[in-house]
Amino acid sequence: MSRGLRSPFVALGLAVALAVTAGCVGEAPSGGAASGDTIKVGVLHSLSGTMAISEVTVRDAELLAIEEINAAGGVLGKKLEPVVEDGASDWPTFAEKAQKLISQDRVATVFGGWTSASRKAMLPVFERNRALLWYPVQYEGLESSPYIFYTGATTNQQIVPGLDYLREQGKKKVFLVGSDYVFPRTANKIIKAYAAANGMEIVGEEYTPLGHTEYSTVVNKLGQARPDAVFNTLNGDSNVAFFKALRGAGITADAMPTVSVSVAEEEVAGIGPDNIAGHLVAWNYYQTTPGAANQTFVAAFKARYGANKVTSDPMEAGYNAVKLWAAAVAKAGTTETEAVKAAAKGIALDLPEGTVTIDGENQHVFKTARIGLVQPDGQIREVWNSGQPIKPDPYLKGYSWATGLS
């Protein structure tokens, strides 16, 4: 088994041990060093391994935001200097590289991660060093660290609206398919609680390791269970194999629609639009989202990386993270961690998905939920939205059916 595909439980244990060891050699100063003509910032994503299909373009979007900030004069009169590291789809590596960025490179903040396993591996590193991580991807909720800002959706801004949409469409029998690590298992625990309270039935639940590419057995079980819909929490390039297997088995989106929460435009391109057109996704941003800020973002991304490139929700959330951090630093007048945290509370910016506001109570952001339908050209057409940004509720305190989940 490759290093990137270790058991998530073993990997997380190793990551915590590494973080403890790193912490014993001394803590970095809070907020990093901003001496000289530049301010160093860390960019930490999987540039290799099974998660590279998703994370490389998040890095690209964050670097674009850094370039735009520098072109406008920088922050506090200084240019931003990105220090890019590869988490290699391996959770202990994320912990190691996070510690390096903080203590050796002395960055002011870090933008990074995708999987919840990588985030949980990094969390103790940032908390011990009192340094800030800006995490750009939707996740399962039930977490709120004082040293993480979460610019992707939490559960009540993505998974719950996705379930609401299925229920409103009359889909009562649901089959759960996910990768075998913390996000899908926790998300499905939440989904099962929702289903029990809302007259839905879970007719199957299957997990496969990250990087898994053989889905004939899972697809056969889908055919036998005959659900009204599939809720998909697979991550990385496993989605390519899964949707190809679905199509190969003759299972159509009309007969058995799949709602995915980790498949966006970039993944659609990798899967092949022919294999996924007609299926649903739940996010907060699409390349087709209307608005001048998004038109500018899409044009800038294509100008920087190529006219054939697409934008997606995690990319946009990574881009937003850089802009929000820069606004907080400008407001604070320093890169010092506690000052930036205090300044970030309530900051609102007009960003590609719309107005994004940081909730000072939990360091998540208000986000509009959007359900989309994958089109034959690989773009995603919005078919429903929440009408206004939803206040983040990472512990689902506003839902009686979620009592006892946290």
Residue ranges and their predicted role:
Residues S35-A61, E85-P92, W114-A117, V177-R185, ...:
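Extracytoplasmic "Venus flytrap"
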Residues E96, E140-G141, P146-A249, T288-T296:
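Extracellular/periplasmic Venus flytrap/periplasmic-binding protein
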Residues I39, D60-P82, A196-G199:
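Signal peptide-proximal N-terminal region
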Residues L101-G113, W134-P136, F175-G178, R226-G236, ...:
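Periplasmic-binding protein-like
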Residues M1-K40, A71, A402-S406:
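Short, low-complexity disordered leader/linker segments with a strong preference
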Residues L351-S406:
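Solvent-exposed, acidic/polar segments of extracytosolic/periplasmic ligand-binding ectodomains
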Residues L246-Y319, V329-G333, N385-S406:
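Extracellular/periplasmic periplasmic-binding protein-like sensory domains
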Residues A28, G32-A33, I53-V58, G73-L142, ...:
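Beta-alpha junction/loop-to-helix N-cap segments that form part of ligand/metal-binding clefts
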